[in-house]
Design a protein with these regions (language model features):
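N-terminal entry module detector
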Residues: 1-11
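C-terminal cap of thioredoxin/glutaredoxin-like
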Residues: 3, 20-28, 102-199
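Structural alpha/beta surface segment adjacent to cysteine/selenocysteine redox centers
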Residues: 8, 17-102, 179-183, 187, ...
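Short beta->alpha junction loops/turns
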Residues: 12, 77, 125-128
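The canonical Cys-X-X-Cys-His
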Residues: 13-16, 151
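Short, surface-exposed alpha-helical recognition segments that flank or form part
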Residues: 14, 57, 123
Length: 199
């Protein structure tokens, strides 16, 4: 039976990159997961009182363009999304690349086999930004989501950090995510954290 969950992402988060590396690796290997990728704008969580929300002043945020293009692909070109999603995390965290350069974003779409012009038109329409606002706000209110990466399973939402990516090991990726999902379904354990980072 397919395991259904949602997972927040923002390309600026290094722990998001590690978690999504496991998820993408597992999905590419055929893991029986039904995953909803939820955009969660970390910039919005740092907006000071009296300042406009990111969706009202998107030019002020360093990660919102990347989120908008990813949401466009997720919704309108889903066959392209996973490759773009993985490439963008690697671009940011292994190459230190920019998330604001639209030439880079659209090149990644084209390289993944997508229609970059259609994605750009979608972003320019404002639709993806509205979706980000809606999903970010909704899950913050209904599930108390506050960060990346957070798993959402039914009524439960759990923030989880992994220390190492899967490095292409599909068996490791699948077993890791399945273990996390097992823990999500065990609410009696609320916190489990090493006092020192293991070697």
């Amino acid at each position: 039976m397919s395991r259904t969950f949602a997972l927040t992402y923002d390309y600026r988060c290094p722990f998001g990159r590690i978690m999504h590396d496991h998820v993408v690796t597992g999905l590419r290997a055929g893991a029986d997961w039904d995953v909803t990728f939820l955009p969660f704008c970390l910039g919005q969580t740092h907006v000071e009182d009296g300042m406009p929300d990111v969706w009202d002043a998107p030019a002020s945020d360093t990660g919102i363009d990347a989120l908008q293009f990813s949401v466009s692909l997720r919704d309108m070109q889903p066959d392209v999304f996973l490759d773009f999603h993985y490439r963008l995390y690697e671009h940011r965290h292994t190459a230190g690349g920019s998330l604001r350069d639209r030439r880079i974003l659209t090149n990644f779409i084209s390289e993944a086999g997508g229609d970059a012009a259609a994605a750009t038109d979608d972003v320019e329409s404002g639709r993806p930004l509205k979706v980000i606002k809606s999903e970010h706000t909704s899950f913050a209110e209904t599930h108390g989501v506050w960060g990346v990466p957070t798993f959402v399973v039914g009524d439960a939402a759990v923030f989880v950090r992994l220390m190492k990516p899967a490095f292409g090991d599909a068996a490791l990726a699948v077993s890791t995510i399945d273990r996390i999902l097992d823990y999500v379904e065990w609410p009696e354990m609320n916190e489990f954290k090493h006092t020192r980072i293991p070697n």
